[in-house]
């Protein structure tokens, strides 16, 4: 039986993975890549899946979030991860690759597939509604297509810069120091508050100002409004000794009952902190906490060093560090189903960094799911979502409308997220030991995915499904 061609825009990691999954299921693909006709400021070749930042896919061990994600992708014979395994270079406990050999091999694998048609041109608009399409254009989507995506999704649902605060694990804060409260006791105590004395504050500000920053790329410097909408915390600190105290670190209206009677003026003046750093829940359970107002351009090592000076965060572990860079991404929880289909157009999918995932393996995971579902749709079958217990499923839930249902994310600005154990559902039986807990997450994921894959296999011609590459 012949099927209508699926169009995939973008041959980065997500687009390449999606193309392979669709073609391997017996459905023809048109893979559109604008390079080398038109390049981006960050790319240097015309190869598919060019790694423009690090050459690392993160930790290999499945007791790490990135490692579990890689393991899950191997279960489904991911083109990206299999190619990365083949061209791995020594990197301790991480999966790192020879960039050139990796991208050349990807390009050859896709170019030689009989069901994949490669087209090199700049896509200026979304394909017609009759076409099953996967949008995988990445964080440097060309301007013309960006405008069309913005028109399709709505002006408030497409972002062009990523100014994100760090996120830390909730169980790594010092509960003896940090207290829960909302300003002026309005509503439930929604924030975790880190009080700072005057000396703490001055020392923190001095280190913040001295902290080493990431060098912006030329195309980021050229954007006049890059820092205007969302000032880095270190820039706020530079504007005056007390500027942070009257901005994101203001202490007014926050009180810890341990300090005594709030209405005793003398006690209040004596005990009120000089400044307060607030942490906001990213999920209902409080496993992930966002540092409110701490968007930053500091290097990651400096963020870890300086932010651990905050009382209560001395042993904080970071899920993700703050970033400020050019990054086209969607307000995905308002737009996407967990299947990566757009709510308003079921035959249009999005995958990769444009959906708000971070990391190479996460991009591949989005491509894998979008590719599987585009194949199912082409065959007139029902699309699927990955099990909640898996890292892939949890990550796709976070960037989809399921997030709106499961968390308070609809109240907060959506921020891109890497793979994290903070996203997966809690175990039925709580395990305190972190190493054993992560092992249990891994075992639960593997069991759920094996069952899921068996069910998925029945939807496809097994001679085609998710075929091996080498």
From Swiss-Prot:
Report if keyword tRNA processing is assigned. Answer: yes
The molecular function terms of the Gene Ontology recorded here are: flavin adenine dinucleotide binding; tRNA (uracil(54)-C5)-methyltransferase activity, 5,10-methylenetetrahydrofolate-dependent
Where, subcellularly, is it found? Cytoplasm
Any one cellular-component term (Gene Ontology): cytosol
Q: Which reaction does it catalyse?
A: uridine(54) in tRNA + (6R)-5,10-methylene-5,6,7,8-tetrahydrofolate + NADH + H(+) = 5-methyluridine(54) in tRNA + (6S)-5,6,7,8-tetrahydrofolate + NAD(+); uridine(54) in tRNA + (6R)-5,10-methylene-5,6,7,8-tetrahydrofolate + NADPH + H(+) = 5-methyluridine(54) in tRNA + (6S)-5,6,7,8-tetrahydrofolate + NADP(+)
Q: Which residues cross the membrane?
A: none
Q: Which GO terms describe its biological process?
A: tRNA methylation; tRNA wobble uridine modification
The prosthetic group or cofactor this protein requires is: FAD
Subcellular location, principal: cytoplasm
EC id? 2.1.1.74
Q: Which SUPFAM superfamilies match?
A: FAD/NAD(P)-binding domain (SSF51905)
Amino-acid positions noted as binding FAD in the UniProt annotation, renumbered to this chain: 10-15
Entry keyword set: Cytoplasm, FAD, Flavoprotein, Methyltransferase, NAD, NADP, Transferase, tRNA processing
What does the sequence similarity comment in the record state about its family?
A: Belongs to the MnmG family. TrmFO subfamily.
Q: Please name the PANTHER family in this protein's record.
A: GLUCOSE INHIBITED DIVISION PROTEIN A, METHYLENETETRAHYDROFOLATE--TRNA-(URACIL-5-)-METHYLTRANSFERASE TRMFO
Q: What does this protein do?
A: Catalyzes the folate-dependent formation of 5-methyl-uridine at position 54 (M-5-U54) in all tRNAs.
Q: Which HAMAP family match?
A: TrmFO (MF_01037)
Query: By what name is this protein known?
Result: Methylenetetrahydrofolate--tRNA-(uracil-5-)-methyltransferase TrmFO
Native source organism of the sequence:
Prochlorococcus marinus (strain AS9601)
